[in-house]
Amino acid sequence: MKTWKTNLEETKQRYINWWNHKGIILSMWEHFQEGVKPHADIAPPAPARDLSQKWFDPQWRAEYLDWYVAHSSLMADMLPVANTQLGPGSLAAILGGVFEGGEDTIWIHPDPNFNDEIVFNPEHPNWLLHKELLKACKAKANGNYFVGMPDLMEGLDVLAALKGTDMVLLDTVMQPEVLEQQMQQINDIYFKVFDELYDIIREGDEMAFCYFSSWAPGKMSKLQSDISTMISQDDYRRFVQPFIREQCQKIDYTLYHLDGVGAMHHLPALLEIEELNAIQWTPGVGEPQGGSPKWYDLYKKILAGGKSVMACWVTLEELKPLLDHIGADGVHLEMDFHNEREVEQAMRIIEEYTGSSSSVSADVHTNQPVGEQDNAQESIRIREEKSQEEDRMKPLYDAIVAGKLEPAVEVTKDAIAAGVLPQDIINGYMITAMGEVGQRFQDGKAFVPQLLMAGRAMKGALELLKPLLAGNASATIGKIVIGTVKGDLHDIGKNLVASMLEGCGFEVINIGIDVTCDKFVEA
């Protein structure tokens, strides 16, 4: 392989060391072009006609990536890798998900015809596109750089892209055996797809991965389960860990992408996978980036567990304190570089380390006057009726907390027949039950599947009450406008919140992602 990276062999050796939990790698997530002397005289292609050409025209992308790599810095351990990703989790598109090109990324929407059957069609246009794109890039690269493996993803994340996150979370409760079968089917297809794409992009046995622009001397993959932030440790060990372990056993070099503080409780299960080589940490929105002291203990746990670590978006100011605290063995630094001067500063720093309630009785006797005794008797009667109502409605509360739809509906029917006011059913029992579920979630005793099941049970019961509330302001609990702010392209959490709010009786106006303030006000 003739390459534009002059120190490629040194970087390869550092990667081999890192996969074996030794040494430091100094790189960055992608590349920068500021002040970089081009490695070849390559002109960029004409601007893409539209988003479709920008993402889904293999020849245009191959020409663009050829120009991009030729003008990118390859200092330190930054690798020449063409980023061929077709959206996060593009295995879902191969299995029938729908592509949509955006300005900065590709979205994969659920398959409207998905019927829970996991089917690989070797003639599917999205599968053919993957192969055509990689072949076009490989031909254009001509040995000057690696063609990266697309971000296929796997498991629950792929299934969520096919049928919707909320439906997958419900499946963990409603059809767990079916879900396990689907996880195995997705894994089997993953290996088939991976191997065929590997044969296109490989350089001998070597390969690179588009995310983190990383390299290995054999097959390598980035593994993940972003949806795992919403499930319990028991569910993770049932629906995620066995299939991640199988990937680690069949792929030579594996890096797990641990995404967000909500996923940290799964670290023990990851460390149990002996074959897993390394763990990458992404703190998530609202958290300090990977070089923060907040994550030192996390990195130490990963390293102590026998895995190498990848820290992302580390700044120059954070670099030395980070290495002082976690050591200099098995550490992959994805720096926040902007120019080659910053790379040189980081290299000098690295050299320092590489060189060296109570019941009321009805027969109460008082000495009160007759009128006051009558009032007391009336109070007792009201309390008795309230107690009877509570006895009647307690099963509704229990059903919603347990996420049981049919019992919730039956109890609501009985309550309507007994004359219990719809407002009392909603305010006194449904909302109270959802409050209990929310508290359990906050305490770590329930997870998103349990929230969704409870919302589903309440929504089913609420449907019986809506006709009785027609024309009443209480027909819905309230109206909520939901969307992600301008610049935020994440919609999984937003859609889950919208689903749960609807289940609780709110009218939800979902205005989508990347929404300006004006559109929020207009809605």
What is the predicted function of each stretch?
Residues 77-89, 93:
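N-terminal accessory alpha/beta regions
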Residues 98-114, 216-230:
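Aromatic- and acidic-residue-enriched carbohydrate-binding clefts of CAZyme catalytic domains
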Residues 52-65:
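Acidic, aromatic-enriched beta-alpha/helix-loop junctions
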Residues 70, 92, 96, 105-109, ...:
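Extracytoplasmic/secretory soluble proteins
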Residues 41-55, 114-120, 436-447:
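Glycine-/proline-rich flexible loop or hinge segments
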Residues 104-132:
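A gly/proline- and charged-residue-enriched helix-loop-helix capping module
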Residues 1-47, 63, 68, 72-81, ...:
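Active-site loop segments of alpha/beta catalytic cores
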Residues 367-523:
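Domain-level signal for soluble alpha/beta catalytic cores
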